[in-house]
């Protein structure tokens, strides 16, 4: 089978793209690159453009570079940079990208031993994937489905790292929207007893509890939620639940 290899951009064009990127003119750099449809960029320029685009929250450049240059050539991208790109994609509503960044990172690192740094990167990429799903399906899927995605990504992390409500603002917001509906309130409480997946991390259920407590109307409902939780679980870390109760001014013993 004949393989067609794209030629690299000329030195002059490369210099202009690089200069625009370094000067923070990402729209100009992207426009120049778009004009080079039949050419490819070298890895150094690719990483420079991605790093500048992430620093300047230029989602158009990130998306274009990803689909036109990284994915077709399966080029490695440094994990920390992927995290920065994912953060931009999340808040610029390029909500399919974080899952692709995570998949790419996992594929690129599948055959090597992981380090503490690798674990931190995977945590962050998974966290942003969960947040992107919650943000993108804020009004269109039930809380149970969002919770299932959370468990699939976060509860299965090696080492069972602490999972804190403050790190999942989109998930927390989605809980609030869901709990405005009567049927979703009942479904949320039911999650304390019937889990869609086996729970591995002791911090997972307390995060769900804290998210529900953050949105219940008042102390009476909070006491009921705590009672429901305690019927099924003992000895789990309730730090976030205690913080939420304190922030909301409820006088409840946890």
Curated annotation (Swiss-Prot):
Mode of membrane association: Peripheral membrane protein
Intracellular or extracellular location(s): Mitochondrion inner membrane
Keywords: Activator, Membrane, Mitochondrion, Mitochondrion inner membrane, Transit peptide, Translation regulation
Annotated GO MF terms: translation initiation factor activity
Entry function: Required for expression of the mitochondrial gene for cytochrome c oxidase subunit 3 (COX3). PET122 seems to work by directly interacting with the small ribosomal subunit to promote translation initiation on the COX3 mRNA.
UniProt region (Essential for PET122 function), positions on chain: 185-254
Entries under InterPro entries matching the protein: Pet122 (IPR008732)
Chain segment of the transit peptide: 1-8
Primary localisation category: mitochondrion
Other remarks on this protein: Present with 468 molecules/cell in log phase SD medium.
Descriptive protein name: Protein PET122, mitochondrial
GO biological process per UniProt: mitochondrial cytochrome c oxidase assembly; positive regulation of mitochondrial translation
GO cellular component, one term: mitochondrion
């Amino acid at each position: 089978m004949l393989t067609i290899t794209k030629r690299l951009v000329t030195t002059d064009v490369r210099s202009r793209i690089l200069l625009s990127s370094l000067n923070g003119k990402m729209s100009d750099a992207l426009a120049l690159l778009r004009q080079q449809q039949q050419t490819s960029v070298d890895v150094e320029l690719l990483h420079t453009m991605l790093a500048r685009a992430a620093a300047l929250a230029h989602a158009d450049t990130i998306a274009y570079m990803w689909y036109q240059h990284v994915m077709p050539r399966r080029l490695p991208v440094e994990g920390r940079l992927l995290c920065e790109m994912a953060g931009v994609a999340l808040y610029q509503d390029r909500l399919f990208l974080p899952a692709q960044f995570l998949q790419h990172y996992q594929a690129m690192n599948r055959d090597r031993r992981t380090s503490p740094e690798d674990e931190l990167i995977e945590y962050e990429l998974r966290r942003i994937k969960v947040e992107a799903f919650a943000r993108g399906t804020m009004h269109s899927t039930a809380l149970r489905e969002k919770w299932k995605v959370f468990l699939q990504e976060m509860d299965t992390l090696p080492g069972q790292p602490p999972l804190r409500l403050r790190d999942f603002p989109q998930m927390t917001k989605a809980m609030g929207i869901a709990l405005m509906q009567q049927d979703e309130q009942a479904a949320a409480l039911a999650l304390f007893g019937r889990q869609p997946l086996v729970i591995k991390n002791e911090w997972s259920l307390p995060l769900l509890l804290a998210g529900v407590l953050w949105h219940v109307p008042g102390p009476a409902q909070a006491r009921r939620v705590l009672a429901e939780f305690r019927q099924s679980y003992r000895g789990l870390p309730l730090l976030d639940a205690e913080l939420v109760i304190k922030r909301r001014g409820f006088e409840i013993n946890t």
